[in-house]
């Protein structure tokens, strides 16, 4: 289990592209409030790529395992889960340290 307070600090690295507040604006990436245990591409007011809408159609949910794999390597995750060989992700930033990943996921779990 991660540490949500530590995860909130780590999430500051994500603020260039994401917001975390309920009802917060989308930026380059979607607002992440309520992402945990939600389906991929769940924000109605964000223009997701076809790869993400394909993952949604396949029923992909943002579980701990999926979030961890995604933040480690977004492009590889989207390629694998969407089944689209041309899949892309705007997210180029990666979290590489397991403790940071666990902490960010713990923080995302509190945003509901």
From Swiss-Prot:
Highest taxon of the lineage: Bacteria
Keywords: Electron transport, Heme, Iron, Metal-binding, Photosynthesis, Transport
Family per similarity comment: Belongs to the cytochrome c family.
Organism of derivation: Rhodospirillum rubrum
Disulfide bond residue pairs: none
Protein name as catalogued: Cytochrome c2
SUPFAM superfamilies assigned to the protein according to its UniProt record, in alphabetical order: Cytochrome c
Post-translational modification, as annotated: Binds 1 heme c group covalently per subunit.
BP-aspect Gene Ontology terms: photosynthesis
Function text: Cytochrome c2 is found mainly in purple, non-sulfur, photosynthetic bacteria where it functions as the electron donor to the oxidized bacteriochlorophyll in the photophosphorylation pathway. However, it may also have a role in the respiratory chain and is found in some non-photosynthetic bacteria.
Pfam families: Cytochrom_C
Residues the record lists as binding heme c: 14, 17-18, 91
An example molecular function term from Gene Ontology annotations: heme binding
């Amino acid at each position: 289990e991660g540490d949500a307070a530590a995860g909130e600090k780590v999430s500051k690295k994500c603020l260039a592209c994401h917001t975390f507040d309920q009802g917060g604006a989308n930026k380059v990436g979607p607002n992440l409030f309520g992402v945990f245990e939600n389906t991929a591409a769940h924000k109605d007011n964000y223009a997701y790529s076809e790869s993400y809408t394909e993952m949604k159609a396949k029923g992909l949910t943002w579980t701990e395992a999926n979030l961890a794999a995604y933040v480690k390597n977004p492009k590889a995750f989207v390629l694998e889960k969407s089944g689209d060989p041309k899949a892309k992700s705007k997210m180029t930033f990666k979290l590489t340290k397991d403790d940071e990943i666990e902490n960010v996921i713990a923080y995302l779990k509190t945003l509901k």
